[in-house]
């Protein structure tokens, strides 16, 4: 053993130092002690006998009966740990004699210490540690070495006769039995162990022998005896606390044994009445534990359905639970709730068991009917548990409810119509009707579930916001509300009309009570919020978000396909009358316009109308008004059809109930809802209200840049202020809304410019003042934050304007102002380019300006890029590459010069970062994200027809290095994402740089069947070319890069076959990679024509030992199949190559 400090010459001293919490002890000395003890454990095969003696020495006190000093508690614990180590980690070093010797030593120690001694001073943790060690020895010795291992311990289960009672021997045995049960059966504990086949077999053998030897019966009888004696003594008032501990521990252990012992041992004429008696004990913890035992018996896995039904009849859970539920109903204590939940679990297990029989078509019909008859009396009891307002109680019966609704859905739910495109829906299939009894039961359940959605009276409402810091009670309620909602939706799927009836009754009663003059005094806020919540979620049942959801349309008009069919019939002169003969379908057009208002309102439409006319929007509690605003936004299509309602909706959201609410949480949520309303509700009515709306919200658009306090000296206040959820982050929604509103006034350019100036002017002023302050004092962090916030606000304002095609940009009156904003941004970034938060905000704002006005900002891109390209942190490069991709897509060819200038500096920065060693998970994530980002950036260059950038005079010297780097990535089997992106790049490159003039001049080698629908439409003049094909094949041929065909044939095309065929390639997870390789093969044939086919048939496929008939089949598929079909063919070909 390694040399140690002279201070650590003995194990006891090392244990004392290692276990000490004295801060004055030298940390180095303490670590040395820990290392020393770890080494001792590692050598347990040599030292366990010594430490077994230490563990079996007399318990801790001054002196033992033999007059010798006893070991300290920490030392005894360490001795047991060493013994545990050899039993658990090195059992092979212990032969039969060693096992027998350890067993005898432990039994002797128990006899001396627990029968005739001080029971280790009564310290429960030492007793429990000893029990664990004995359990590990049991698993090593039983049944092969010591089949009677447990017998001496069973003898200890006899109730003590002494007064006061010495229960430590019994508690030790009870704990031992618990440890054994957990090791060989407890699924939770077993998941924490390394489970080998040998261990599983061993556990099965131990359980079997315990059952066959009768040890299970002995153990259960002994445990029941302790419980019986304990109850007797407690009722007499003798040592109640000690006996309560013993009974509690024994019930826990009995619960752990019953799942795997013989049913006849756990359930017989003696035990059943005993369980009933326990369930009525005054101590709730005993009752709860017994309910757990009862649940295990109910759920016992009996294969024969007849036998299982017989056991369930004997247990009679409904008869047992019913009076207990009645007795405890209304109890508010946590213990009562826990007991009631345990009863609910019993009922749930009973229901699930019966459903498992009644729903099993392989079971005899008589038994299935019996199971259903037995279940019916449980249903009223199920509803009583569901109606409990303590969440854990109704949640305890969730499995029963889920299974019940599942079988009802299968029996009664109408199937989803399988309508193909262009076809009218098929007529609904005939389903059995719900019986009156079942419908009443579901109505009662639905009513209970809906009322459970109401906020508890003792819970204070909070506006939605930071869910991470949600109050524990509110989080529990929202979780419970979600569970109830899922059950409600299931019932709605079974019987939609029932759901409509119950919801409408509750909502209308609430709205009528409020509207009739009672107001908030007649309708508590919880009830009002519930009504709004029901309206808000009502539309989820129909899964229809179109205007048709608000009107009752005839079946033949319910879908666009059906309306087209009806128009065709009307146009053909059909004379057979139908319910839609008097319906105005409107002019036939691609827009499928329909005058919905001629139809009666659907239930949802009626509820929305009731909400609007009831005045509930003025309810004096924010939970109700906020939910009303959520309804407005969710069902905006309804309000758009009723333009007369829109002014009132906007006014409600703009006043003190909405964005001006005194509650910050409500206000912030309303910022988002108002923005959503402005975005989704663009029509003439809103256009006329833009000016007053903007005036009403102007005071809410004042930006205050406030630095937050930092938690540590190293924390950056700027980063903290600009990440996560903040008031300003929500405030930005208002600027996006203002952009939407200003754009609506496009018909009046002068008005639009005035409104734009009214919004953007203060932002530019705030930006300018912040920049000036930061220029004067670069350490003025508040000024930096002000610049960030104002840039973000300008970006969100621009985001409210739509993307306009380049050909219309010159007609936009706001092109000039947005270009001025971009120039102000450039001035800011040039001064504050060293600030990460300013760079982030500038990228966002500039990208939004590019979206809003397009190519006019292209001339500013080089200046922007030059200002920031040298300032990026490694983690920021990813965001910058994404920013460049966005610019390329929006500005396309206008960015060529910028990208040409930027490519080499970018590559230098990227590869500098990627070449740095990875020292932790953060660096690994940065590397992975950066690799994906630059590959995606390269692919975007190809997609936007900017491939010429790679071969300009400036960049051509690095072209081969780029190709080599990317090609190496196709061979990197450890990084599938990079492989896929690299193959994707090369599949585009063969078109860009490898298209031969010969292939372009000759007819295509592809059959017409290989052309996609889009390609056929393009060639036929039926549609415009998408961007990816904006360059014709003839133009590509003129740009062909001399020598690139050699790279294709020597490297790329062989790699497309060889990489996925390699044994290192993960074929199961690499399907997308193989698909990209297939595209590379197909694009090569498209670019090179017959030459590529000849190369594959005469050279490549032969080198791959591909039989000629298989090779010909592959080429035939390649030239006749569409791309998506060839991908599958190629994947199958690769799998066949791999064998």
From Swiss-Prot:
GO terms for molecular function: small GTPase binding; tRNA binding. GO terms for cellular component: cytoplasm; nuclear matrix; nuclear pore. This is Exportin-T. The lineage of its organism: Eukaryota, Fungi, Dikarya, Basidiomycota, Agaricomycotina. Keywords: Cytoplasm, Nucleus, RNA-binding, Transport, tRNA processing, tRNA-binding. Gene3D superfamilies: Leucine-rich Repeat Variant. PANTHER family: EXPORTIN-T (PTHR15952:SF11), EXPORTIN-T/LOS1 (PTHR15952). Transmembrane segments: none annotated. Residues 562-589 are annotated as: Disordered. It holds the Pfam family Exportin-T. GO terms for biological process: tRNA processing; tRNA re-export from nucleus. It comes from the Eukaryota. Its main location: nucleus. Residues 572-589 have a biased composition (Polar residues). Belongs to the exportin family. It is found in: Nucleus; Cytoplasm. tRNA nucleus export receptor which facilitates tRNA translocation across the nuclear pore complex. Involved in pre-tRNA splicing, probably by affecting the interaction of pre-tRNA with splicing endonuclease. It comes from Cryptococcus neoformans var. neoformans serotype D (strain B-3501A). InterPro entries: ARM-like, ARM-type_fold, Exportin-1/Importin-b-like, Exportin-T_C, XPOT.
